Amino acid sequence: MEQQPRKMNAFDWVLIFSTLALAVLFVISGILPNLPLFQATIFGQDIPLFMLSVWAWLFLFWIITNVKRMTGVRFTRSNKIALLVALSVLLLYYAYSLMTRQFIYYWDYVLYYRMQVGISKSFHADGFFNGIIDVIKSVWYNSYSLLNNVFLAAPYTFVPRTPNLFVAISAASILPSLYFLIAMFIKVVERFIQPKHGSLFFIGGMTLAVGFPLIHRALLFGQPDLLGLIFVFLIILLTISYDFSKTDFLRYFLLIVLIIMTCASRRWYMFWLVAYFVCYGVYVILQAILKKRWSDVKRTVLFTLATGLTLAVVFLPMIIVVLRAHYSVSYSAYNVSGFSGELKSQAQYLGIGLLAVILTGTVYGIVKSKTRALTIFALIDVFFTIFIFTRIQNMGYHHTLILVPAYLLLMLICFGGICRLEKRWMLALSSTVVLGFCGVNAAVCATSSAESLPSPFSNVALIPPQRTDIQQIRAVNRWILEHCSKGESAYIIPHGYPYNPDVFRSCDYPDFSVSKHVPYGSAVLGTHYFPDDLLLAKYVLTCEPFCNLSLAEKYNTAFLSEIPQKHFTQVAQFDMGNGYIFYVYERILPMDREEIQFYQDTFAQESKQFPELFSVVWDELIKELK
């Protein structure tokens, strides 16, 4: 059965003309990069980058409108009110959280902010053509791509360039689209479950989604990886009820585009893509074989081949990088407990309460024939995703976003079973217990900054640790700025929490002055290079008690040993007011062969395992001596 051609609408033409306009600008910028248009700004933002960002959102909204039409989802008045209330509650909470926090974004929490500042400078300095090339290269070669920053460039144009406002703009940009798609997802799942109380099911589903802490942790801490979840839900909506029984070229196009966007958003979303499409492909082909619908098998295979070929062409440089890299070795510091340990971590992330809801949904879904396939699919998807992910590393809070759709589906199945109850007192009691606990769980997480929460609740504190030492950190920064001239650096050895180099670098953003003198630091075996600043920096800082991560304490012990200390003298110390004291050492003798040899001997084992991260650095230092 072939699809009927769809009539073009106004939105289609707007997208076509805007795409052509951007393509023309791209070509012209490659030929005439110095045209005034390519140097023009709006509120300090490069206008061509602003236009690219607007186009990206336009394209995404076009996809969403097409997916909504293809799924046939219709919202009732009560559905729209519930969605609006849910978004209002979320945005108010995000605003409150940002206005009341005393937090310094560091490491992955601040990386997207830095990239946002960087992409603006790069488009303005290098031009529109080279800016787009940089975005493409970041997708191919970097662990963090600039795709998310392209989407956020236009909204971020109109606010001061602070980390808190970056998080605020990310939330205001991403959450409405994401929860609109989650609302569509709830309506589609409703068709499978067929609850007797549809309005209650939708309101309960939105309550479960809004109060699910794992959705919010990454974004509240400065990581807008949530954008990729928009693409994930779009893929699910396009496939959940499609079995290749008819040809649908627009659906194929949208799926391929969304797969590309998902991969480009964050590389680890590929684990979800592999697990999901393996499960989906096996299910569709088995169904077709059992029903002897060979044309469905043919369409599935042809779509798979077309998708694979497209991805191979688009991501060829990335594929080469991935195949050449040994991530299981270089990321070994992040693989702390493997598959079994990750299952335990996921149980802790969820908490006993939500785990009980998910397990209840699993049992109910398997028992009921209408939801059996969907439930088994979700279970296999979760375990398969975790299994392949832990071949490389364990999952952090942001990585767990790829499990959110399956978790949410199983919770919806549980609540859908409740909404099929006929006795009103049973319906009222069960709904109150499930939604009441989820509300309490959300409140506990939303008001906590503790590292560990009671086991009945999700171990996902949504309030960042509140700092009381910001003035002390600024005092250290002022000292560094006063004592370091251009080209001089101060290396900070601690690399854990509460202190690491990035805490000092990020303290006064958007003022980047300290970052010019304080390097990012080095600690993670297999990922970070040997810190040559131990031998090159004018100042080296350490603290007591020490803040360790991976190799940081070994670097600290080595630095405080006799041979390196012959080259330094202590010149200052800072009481941080919380039991930590920082000591500043100034280099009084230049590095020599004895000092280099000491580090070579101390880290011989690490160099044997990762020569490109150690020996290569030492060889360069020896060349400098010569």
Annotated model-derived regions:
Residues 99-110, 123-150, 171, 345-349:
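Membrane-proximal lumenal/periplasmic loop motifs of glycosylation machinery
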Residues 462-492, 497, 506-626:
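C-terminal luminal/periplasmic domains and tails of membrane-associated envelope-modifying transferases
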